Each structure stands twice: as structure tokens, then as C-alpha cells.
Amino acid sequence: GRQYGLGYGHDLKQVGMNVVFSPVSDVNIEPDNPIIGPRSFGSSLPRVSAMINATVGGFLDAGIAPTLKHWPGHGATKEDSHLHLPSVDATLTDAIHLAPFTDNMLTQKNVNGAPIIMSGHLLAKGLDQNRPVSISKIALTNKLKKELGFLGVIVSDALNMRGITSFL
């Protein structure tokens, strides 16, 4: 993880980049997940969180700002958010999917955390019953920033994805 972030980060730096929309921080617990699959570090929470931590450290050491994605976790869905608006079970979100983000994001207690989080286009009913996370003040401001203490930048996944355009 660290060598990946460091090596990839140095390559990006050489061509003038300073931000990367990586690493995928989803715990892929749904075997039929059509979009996360091999992009994830796996289905084990401790492994995923440790690999995210190492990768973030490598990117930061290379001078690249990494992005944790797809908050609050897209690994339990059976739908592709490029095509549909997936939903995530609230208990899974809290118990499994938040940890790779909360363990590795920029906060007052973790000044070496990732400074960017990309929100996923999904309905996380435990956060907001009515709006996808990517356009939810409850999920982004109340939960991510205020409750969890994220101090960095929040970006949205692509706005041409059906997961969000079908909702708007």
C-alpha cells in the first residue's frame, strides 16, 4: 500500500499533478457488487483500513493529496451507481463502511489523514432517508464534518452518473 501510493504519487508529481481521486476506500462485502469489486482492497475491514492508511501515507509523502472514496461506503451494494441509485443498509454503514474513512481522513486528531473525500451517489438510509449522500446536508455537513470532524474538501462523484441524475 505505501509503496503503491509513493510510487504512483511520484509519477503523478513528475507530470505536474498534485491531487489523485484514489484510493477506493470501500469494503467490498457484496460479492455481486458490479462496480467496486477489484478496485477495493478487499472484504476484510482491518485489511482495507490498513491498506488505505498505507496508501494515503505514500501519496502524502510524494506530495499528492489523496481522495478517500466513495463515502460513506459503496461496498455492500448490488447496483452500479453509474446506472442506478443504490441504497446501503444503515447498520452496515455504521458498523463496517465508515471505518476506512474515519480511520484515514484529515481531522484535528489525524493531521496526516487524507484531505479529500469523494461522496458516493447512494442512498444511505441511516444518514438521510430522502436524499443521496452526494447532495445531502445531513450526510455531508452534519455527519461527516460536524460529527466525525472531517476538516478537508468534499467532492462529488461524477454528476453525469444515473445514480444522481435519476434522482434530480
At which residue positions do the language-model features occur?
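Active-site-adjacent helix-turn-beta-strand microarchitecture at beta-sheet edges
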Residues: I36
